[in-house]
Amino acid sequence: YQGDYQFSHEIEHYVGKELFTSSMVLKTSGFNFYRSLNRELYEFDPEKSFDDSNSTLYRCVDYLQKKNHTTVITYNYDTNLEYLLKKRGVRYTVVYDDNSFSDQEAQVDIYHVHGLLPYDRYTERKYLDSLVFTEEEYYYLYNNPYSWNIAKQLHDFKFNVCVFIGISLT
């Protein structure tokens, strides 16, 4: 970090404990929020995480492999699901903003309704612009009835059986 290390460490510690991230945290001098988030999302042992047949992610991919054209709506920013699908040879598409679209030939369509932060491209503006972090961003998103994010969720919640995994809803 370029700024005060102790201050950066305190912010890093508390950001994960708050329901909403303040836009002030994202603009704090010397603290690279996106680099820290990327590190938190992807610092793990891939072999242990992706090859563990008892993990929730592994079992989800087992299920998705057996289905023909399934939709996944995720509130996660990471691409771990995509990595495991690719590793298993499952064709998928990713939708994370107004300029990305599903593919009829894909077996799985993955909708990142709060944005996407790929492991190796976390500094690219198109991904950073897709992320929903702050209270203001959540307010704007959920009060915009014409956004694809809301329309997709409402459609699937109304017409499909939905399973929530790893979400507290509190």
How would you describe each model-predicted region?
Residues 1-170:
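Conserved catalytic-core helix/loop/strand module for nucleotide-ribose chemistry
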